[in-house]
Amino acid sequence: MVATLTRALGSRHLTVAEDAVQDALLTAMQQWPFRGVPEHPEAWLFQVARNRALDRLRHGKMAADKEPALARESATVALPSAAPLLREEWPAVEDDELGLLFLTCHPALPADARVALALKLAGGFSVGEIARAFLSQESTIAQRLVRAKRQLRDEHVSFGTPAPHELGERLDSVIDALYLMFNEGYAATAGDQLVRDEVAFEAIRLAGMLAAHPATVCPRVWALLALMLLHAARFPARIDSEGTLFLLRDQDRRMWDRATIAEGLRALDRAAAGETVTALHLEAGIAACHAAAPSWDATDWPQIVELYDELLALTHSPVVAVNRAVAVSRIDGPLAGLAALDAIENASALERYPLLPAIQAELWREAGDLERAAACYRAALGLARSSPEHRWLTSRLSLLV
């Protein structure tokens, strides 16, 4: 409903649309328990939201301009129903939903604002839920959302799917925002929870929406979806009921969601249809190698190193180089892995990255130098950002001292 109202009102009245829908839902909560649910609840909600929007605009003397557009929407409104998270054929998406996603992920907005706005408007998250997901104060998130909406209004950003000549750049912005959203769900940057399923699954839903629409479906969207699904399949094995972290090496692979893996592999097959190999394709390929391996030791490490080599050549990312070093250590031993870590270019960018000393600690432990391993574990503890990471590092250090 927010998307449909925003299309009718224009993106500069995004807040009006959002408030009108909230008013309609509140009215339903107050009336339906006593008067019963109307025969067509979606149409009823839209009509109430439409009237609330007009009331708000009348105060600004703009209702007359918008009433014809709202009337057209009232006559044709057909809101999408909820769909399963994962399925072989992704549900069709309404153009209004897609337009709202492009609006929230406009490249003019800062990356953190795109993710927050997408969760709020395209995902339906409350300010409180977003604040909890990112361990921020509600006031901080509320201010971020207000600034983002003001920027969209001031820059006269239009609502809807971009024109063909600008679709590529705009789609990249949406993909980047969803990638960040999923990463925050997969490994939260701070707090008591490492995995925030609700954020990761919302990123998957929105990526599936892109894959289901003819205007946005393309190989890199399928690659994004494949990457998300293949990682999400391991969620049940990453954290136990007490919040204990299990690295990939130590996970019980019987707990992996095989249906989600199959869905991810199908998405990866569809991603292969294009001629361009992107970083998303390579990351999804690495995730597929892990998903296919019966055990840590039986993983196709040479193939993974090859994929990391391609990814490193494409991105020049020091984080990619760290992950590549782990794969090298599985083939040539811990000292080779440590040498690969020492050879990383732009290593200064990793000064606050806890995974680097944690990996060094593991490799020194495997090499038999427990003193160096303990020192690296302590360094990693000083950088750990979440409680599960801190507990895991503490437990590893306790085995050495």
Protein language model features and the residues they cover:
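Amphipathic helix-loop-helix modules that constitute alpha-helical solenoid scaffolds
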Residues: 60, 68-129, 136-309
